[in-house]
Amino acid sequence: FWHYPVLVLVGCIVGVINTMAGGGSLITLPILIFLGLPSNVANGTNRIGLLMTAFSANMGYRSKGILTSPFSTYVGLFALIGSLIGAQIAIDIDDKIFNKILSIIMIIVILVILFSPQILKGDLNERIKGKSLIVSCFVFFIIGMYGGFVNAGIGFIIMLFLNLYNRMNLIRVNATKSAVILIYTIGAFLTFLINDLVNFGYGLSLGFGTLFGCLLYTSDAADEEDSVDLG
């Protein structure tokens, strides 16, 4: 029984982390595996919290009129296609191999966080049409594959690409990130669900905590200064 309140508490922390930048799955996946779930079930269960985080973040940004469609829709759909492929790979892979890959990913993501370039500040000249849109759709297909496979640390990758390539400011980066993650996570979650790889008790406990943490952050997110240092 104690697993459930612990997961709610973990979810609160992860909700804030995911909405600010990402990387919450680096915490939740190992915890779910530690609690005894097979790696593929932990991966599928983790998607419930991700869905609730992305959904509540989207509602927060929408309530403040921060929208980045149709760009976020276009890249989100390409990410969705990629996520279906990535999720199926995660389902088919052996648990021991997945855990080794996850360990390597955790090290890489930590290094990215420590040594990533600083987010660009101020009013930027966005590049979200024409050739930039085509490149973005291709990149988000790859990002979606990774997100469908494991999702850990993907928020940092998305933030860096949207800011450094698409030249979005921090608030629009976070709004776009939340929309894209919501779109592709629906596909990944359904893939795990169809294969009966979701523990709803753990997932909902984590999800409700995540929802609270996410709302805690997004209530003030649109009023914060347009800068962040991912290092």
Regions found by a protein language model. Give the residues of each.
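Selected transmembrane alpha-helices and immediately adjacent juxtamembrane segments
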Residues: 1-38, 125-174, 204
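Alpha-helical transmembrane segments of integral membrane proteins
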Residues: 5, 44, 97-104, 134, ...
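Lipid-exposed faces of alpha-helical membrane segments in multi-pass integral membrane proteins
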Residues: 9, 13, 52, 81, ...
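Membrane-interface alpha-helices at helix entry/exit sites of multi-pass transporters
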Residues: 39-45, 70-71, 168-177
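Selective hydrophobic functional segments
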Residues: 44, 48-97, 185-220
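Transmembrane helix exit motif
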Residues: 56-66, 104-128
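Loop-to-transmembrane alpha-helix entry segments
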Residues: 92-106, 118-124, 197, 201, ...
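Single conserved hydrophobic/aromatic residue that forms the stacking wall/gate
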Residues: 217, 221-231
